[in-house]
Amino acid sequence: MSPNPTPDLTTIQRQQTEKILNPIARGQVTQDLSENIILTTVDDLHNWARLSSLWPLLYGTACCFIEFAALIGSRFDFDRFGLVPRSSPRQADLIITAGTITMKMAPALVRLYEEMPEPKYVIAMGACTITGGMFSSDSTTAVRGVDKLIPVDVYIPGCPPRPEAIFDAIIKLRKKVSNETIQERATVMEQTHRYYSTTHNMKAVDPILTGKYLQTATRQTPPKELTDAIGMPIPPALASQQQKEEINRG
């Protein structure tokens, strides 16, 4: 005789009746019930639905965007992440800035960001977008970092970054989205107009480009004794008026 006999139909019905009459008793989860019910939270369900529906607004201004264009092809296939490029900011929840941002384009970028619905995210792609890149030292029009205009969630350094780096940024952004809560999104503060404010601390300085670059102290011609000693000819652009007359006289 088996030590644990299989209960018959009458015993099972009696046990179910006792559970109904005494609901405080500890319930038993059957195998069928455990295989057909998923326990989750509203945050996880909402974030799971948004992970595969990131619709980007592509804001490409320079050579970095050519690397992003490679993702559209079949070799990389960014559709696997559910990325659907949109042409309208009202239909996008992600804006990808790739390339140099100039002062003249800054108001347009801020306006596009403000027209996007919440929640919205920003990916800064390339050195020119993050810090100004090669134009950060002497350019009078390049913005030294797009984060001075709009808040950035993920940075992709490189000049230009490869498509694999863009995939890595998308994965990191998906992790950030999956950890958000409804309470956190409800308490997001409104974006301020950081591009321009009346209380700025800008100071007027002398212009850098004055047209007198060759007349600076570091660009003056060497003494005539030195040029004669080493036999170095004087470039016409660096020659003074007196030296030019001497050259013309032979």
Curated annotation (Swiss-Prot):
Pfam families noted in UniProt: Oxidored_q6
Plastid is among the record's keywords: no
Membrane-protein topology: Peripheral membrane protein
GO CC annotations on file: plasma membrane-derived thylakoid membrane; respiratory chain complex I
Major place of residence: membrane
Domain of life: Bacteria
BP GO terms, sorted: aerobic respiration; electron transport coupled proton transport; photosynthesis, light reaction
UniProt cross-references to PROSITE patterns, sorted A to Z: COMPLEX1_20K
UniProt function note: NDH-1 shuttles electrons from an unknown electron donor, via FMN and iron-sulfur (Fe-S) centers, to quinones in the respiratory and/or the photosynthetic chain. The immediate electron acceptor for the enzyme in this species is believed to be plastoquinone. Couples the redox reaction to proton translocation, and thus conserves the redox energy in a proton gradient. Cyanobacterial NDH-1 also plays a role in inorganic carbon-concentration.
Subunit structure: NDH-1 can be composed of about 15 different subunits; different subcomplexes with different compositions have been identified which probably have different functions.
Protein name: NAD(P)H-quinone oxidoreductase subunit K
Native source organism of the sequence: Rippkaea orientalis (strain PCC 8801 / RF-1)
